[in-house]
Amino acid sequence: MSTFHIETSIGSTDPAVVIAALHNHELMIKTLCPALVSYAFESGDKATSAVYTVTDKKPIGQTTFKLTLTNTPGGVDSLVNAKPPVGILTIAATWRVADGKLTEDVVIDGNFMMKKVAKGNVEKTHPEQHTKLLEAARA
């Protein structure tokens, strides 16, 4: 397993506003998947915990995966269950707002190749996703 910790200052933004943005599943999906092709609600309750099928564009084709978003008092938990051609990939993250920061703790599990690809993607895109999410929360 690979783990990562990412944090971004929320500045003067009210923490409740940032938490509300995290609880907005449509906003989270659009923020987490910048190359989003489509998504569909599968099951659960969008106000608490829901499963979505997400299709994302990749450099070569598209990938479809299950995304579970679970609202918590301080943020949201996300769980990606993907089945790419070369194995299974699970990305679990906790997004929390506390002490003037948006923090994300990520755990990636899969075979060596999938972990390496996912790790590079998380390191490259997630700080940018924090910024976009905070911009949307402030809008």
For each predicted feature, which ranges?
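Intrinsically disordered, low-complexity acidic/polar segments
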Residues: 17, 61, 111-115
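Short, low-complexity, polar/charged sequence segments that are solvent-exposed and flexible
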Residues: 25-29, 40, 71-75, 99, ...
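Short, highly charged C-terminal tails/helix-capping segments
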Residues: 131-139
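Hydrophobic ligand-binding cavity/cleft-lining segments
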Residues: 1-49
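Residues that form generic nucleotide/phosphate-binding pockets
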Residues: 21, 125, 136
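Hydrophobic-cavity lipid-handling domains and compact docking modules
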Residues: 38-39, 43-91, 95-97
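A very general structural signal that marks isolated residues within well-ordered alpha-helical segments
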Residues: 23-24, 110, 135
